[in-house]
Amino acid sequence: MRNKAKGFPNPISFNGNKANNADEHASKRPDGTTRDRPQERMRSSNHFNSL
């Protein structure tokens, strides 16, 4: 069965909830350019934990 047939709720939006250090680990700079080393950025953030 598909999700809608089972009665799952609509997707949740997180408006206004932003981590304190989200700008430091963002994929884009304020001027719109992409950061060069995304793997290092992910390792430095607290969202990715290696075992």
From Swiss-Prot:
HAMAP family: SspK. The keyword Translocase does not apply. One of its GO terms (cellular component) is endospore-forming forespore. GO terms for biological process: asexual sporulation; sporulation resulting in formation of a cellular spore. Residues 21-43 have a biased composition (Basic and acidic residues). Residues 1-51 are annotated as: Disordered. The keyword Oxidoreductase does not apply. It is found in: Spore core. This is Small, acid-soluble spore protein K. It holds the Pfam family SspK. Its main location: other. Keywords: Sporulation. It comes from Shouchella clausii (strain KSM-K16) (Alkalihalobacillus clausii). Belongs to the SspK family. Induction: Expressed only in the forespore compartment of sporulating cells. The gene is sspK.
